[in-house]
Design a protein with these regions (language model features):
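C-terminal segment of N-terminal export signals and the immediately downstream linker at the start
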Residues: 20-38
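Short Pro-Gly-centered flexible turn/kink motifs
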Residues: 248-266, 702-708
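Aromatic-lined carbohydrate-binding/catalytic grooves of carbohydrate-active enzymes
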Residues: 293-368, 372-425, 441, 458
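Carbohydrate-binding surface patches
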Residues: 624-668, 705
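C-terminal beta-strand-rich structural cap/linker in extracellular carbohydrate-active enzymes
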Residues: 686-711
Length: 711
């Protein structure tokens, strides 16, 4: 979560059990290659074609003639699936094998002789959502010289409907995921060159037509690129790994997995498409049915310097609020060489408990949490090594060398998880603490920019032939999975100074992600609207922070201070839009405020959480402006069985005290009890609620939370 001292500078395969296996075949003559393959979903038809160096997908309305693909735009030179060598020569392919079990699944094996490469490609339409997922893996034939891969494409897709608008997410630290509208007459290029998913853009794009929505999402946590180029009757999308300073050498028997890419044409508006995306992403999460506990986090009450005394004082407070987990954030550790008065950022990497801060060890706090029926959580930054770390001096070769340079002695460094010994160090140190202390929740932070990454000199070629970021992130995903295997009940939360590394791949290996270091509720409301276009609410972790107003220091990104508008209920309702927690000096709250928060925690746990985490989301208004000077904002979540829903309504600067919100997704003939928190109950049929529920909010910067349940 902490943004300071920044460094500058393989994707999970979709399940394909329905596909019958096929044996590798010899490379046939070119005239044996099938020209195209067609995949069909309820709202889309996809034509896959091999065009020399390019493997393309043309997407149509299911009623359109398939042969319109013959008029599709020809792929340009940079549409090649793979380019090799300093000259970036496109690789020409032919089909070595194919297997299409049905209209939803396709496997291709493509082969090239010069260079000696094979591409294994799987297209699978998800039966539950109709979304198409492509997985691509490159491997060396086994005969011939090593191949220097310098560019790849994980997707090239042509859309054959006129596009009304292109929607994407852009931002900065503490101002993530602001909804943007792309140009209608020029190419849109989204990318990261920071060595992580990035604050600047999300690897997400939505394109709207009068009758449909197209979605594209790249599942990758390192440098990526996603481009959209409007055409007279549609658009072309291309993307995958960013080829900026990319080089990956494949020797005989070596393999490179490209990022998984999700794509789809879906009938209806953006809400309908987002619901299907959320369904897919929820199913891809670890332990998708496990509730995310309401947590109390120590960062804002005791930023960077927790102690046994301060934590033990807050544990019973968290319990009285109704929280389910208590997480000790950064600062609990020392280095192998002993105690230090240096700040939390300088001491990361060795992961030894500080006995100055915790004289009886962390186990004392863990036991106190158990005694109060709380899970115990602990913050780590496994990849980032502080300048005081002993392991850094013992093994400088384990650190990323950006631009070929060793990290400066007084700066933080990044442990290269592509190095097996470095990976093992991180695994051993983290799991030792998790086991010894009894940790149920691990918060995994990453306060660094990696650029293109880099290898230390003198490492074996078997390592340095790999692109350093590819090696690092494949190691990261393995480390996430290994820790969860060792501790199957553990909740794994990811963070990168907020939403700096928030993507569909890192969240295929973790449960939840801290979405922003932004402490202001008004700005955070806009961040929720944007983030929840690309990610389901269950993975979006947020806290009640700045209460009472002015109690929290502003981030450097908000030099003018935190916008203090919004009462306590408003701030609670914003934080309850995803997974929910508290990080504030609750021990100093007035009794009435404490009771208000405790009541909201109980309501969230018992009623709101299962609907928000697993239901369909409808954005009922436009994204509110980050400065709060907008009209109204509203989000409606409805359970999959259509028997329950929750409405969050926020009055911003609007002079109007009332709005009517249509609540879709309910059973027309069923009768529902609808009530705002602490308000009277109204009984209405689903058809009446679909026509509109009147909501009154008396003052600006107040909110209402309505619960709707079958009578």
């Amino acid at each position: 979560m902490k943004r300071r001292r920044f460094l500058h500078g393989g994707a999970a395969a979709v399940a394909s059990s329905a596909l019958p296996p096929f044996a590798p075949q010899g490379v046939p003559a070119a005239d044996q290659n099938p020209p195209s393959w067609t995949l069909s979903a309820a709202s889309a038809r996809y034509v896959v074609r091999l065009r020399g160096a390019a493997l393309t997908v043309d997407c149509f309305h299911p009623g359109d003639a398939v042969d319109r693909a013959d008029g599709a735009p020809s792929p340009p030179d940079d549409a090649a699936l793979v380019a090799v060598g300093p000259a970036r020569r496109p690789v020409a392919w032919r089909v070595a094998a194919s297997r299409q079990a049905d209209a939803s699944n396709l496997r291709l094996v493509l082969s090239a002789d010069d260079p000696p490469l094979i591409a294994d490609v799987v297209f699978a339409i998800d039966g539950a959502t109709g979304l198409l997922v492509r997985d691509t893996s490159l491997r060396h034939h086994g005969i011939g010289a090593a191949v220097d891969i310098v560019a790849t494409l994980a997707v090239w897709c042509a859309i054959h409907e006129p596009i009304d608008s292109m929607l994407y997410l852009a931002g900065a630290w503490a101002h993530e995921t602001q909804l943007q509208h792309g140009p209608s007459d020029g190419a849109l290029r989204l990318e990261s060159r920071t060595g992580k998913t990035g604050f600047e853009f999300q690897p997400y794009l939505a394109l709207r037509t009068p009758r449909s929505t197209y979605l594209c999402e790249i599942f990758w946590s390192g440098n990526w690129i996603l481009q959209a180029t409007p055409q007279p009757q549609g658009a072309v999308l291309r993307g995958g790994l960013n080829d900026w300073r990319f080089r990956h050498r494949l020797d005989a028997g070596r393999r490179l997995a490209l990022p998984s890419v999700l794509f789809g044409r879906l009938e209806g508006d953006l809400n309908a498409a987002t619901q299907r995306l959320h369904d897919f992403r929820r199913a891809r999460r670890p332990d998708p049915d496990r509730p995310i506990p309401v947590q109390f986090n120590s960062w804002y009450p005791h930023a960077g310097e927790p102690t046994a005394e301060s934590m033990l004082a807050l544990v019973p407070v968290a319990r009285r609020l109704g929280c389910e987990a208590f997480v000790v954030d950064a600062g609990w550790y020392r280095t192998d060489e002993g105690e230090s008065a240096a700040d939390w950022a300088s001491r990361t990497g060795d992961w030894r408990t500080s006995h100055v801060r915790f004289p009886n060890g962390l186990r004392e706090v863990s036991r106190a949490c158990r005694d109060h029926a709380l899970r115990f959580g602990l913050w780590f930054e496994p990849e980032v090594i502080g300048p005081l770390s002993a392991i850094r001096r013992a093994h400088p070769e384990w650190m990323h060398h950006l631009d070929g340079k060793a990290p400066a002695p007084d700066q933080r460094a990044v442990l290269n998880l592509g190095i097996p010994a470095a990976w093992q160090h991180a695994f051993d140190r983290v799991t030792r603490i998790l086991s010894a202390v009894g940790v149920d929740w691990m918060k995994w932070d990453f306060n660094a920019d990696l650029g293109a990454g880099g290898w230390a000199p003198g490492l074996p070629a078997a390592l340095t032939d790999q692109d350093p970021l590819v090696a690092h992130y494949q190691g990261l995903y393995r480390l996430q999975d290994a820790i969860r295997r060792w501790f199957p009940e553990l909740i794994l939360e990811m963070c990168a100074s907020g939403g700096g590394r928030l993507d569909g791949e890192i969240l295929a290996h973790a449960h939840v992600n801290w979405i922003s270091d932004q402490p202001g509720a008004l700005r955070k409301l806009a961040i929720h609207f944007g983030t929840q276009l690309a990610h389901p609410a269950v993975v979006c972790n947020d806290w009640l922070v700045d209460w009472p107003p002015g109690d929290t220091a502003a981030t450097a990104a908000d030099a003018d201070g935190i916008d203090e508008r919004g009462d306590l209920a408003f701030r609670l309702h914003v934080a309850m839009l995803g997974s929910f927690g508290i990080s504030a000096r609750a021990d100093r709250w007035a009794a009435a405020d404490f009771a208000t928060v405790a009541a909201h925690v109980a309501l969230y746990r018992d009623t709101v959480r299962p609907i928000v985490h697993h239901g369909d989301q409808y954005l009922l208004t436009a994204t509110p402006p980050a400065d709060g000077n907008g009209d109204w904002a509203a989000i409606w979540y409805v359970a999959k069985d259509a028997r329950r829903g929750v409405l969050f309504a926020f009055r911003l600067a609007s002079p109007e005290t009332a709005r009517v919100f249509a609540l879709p997704g309910l059973l027309s003939a069923a009768r529902y009890r609808a009530a705002a928190v602490a308000g009277p109950v109204t009984v209405l049929p689903g058809s009446a609620l679909a026509a509109g529920l009147p909501v009154t909010i008396e003052r600006p910067f107040q909110s209402a939370l309505w619960v709707v349940e079958t009578d």
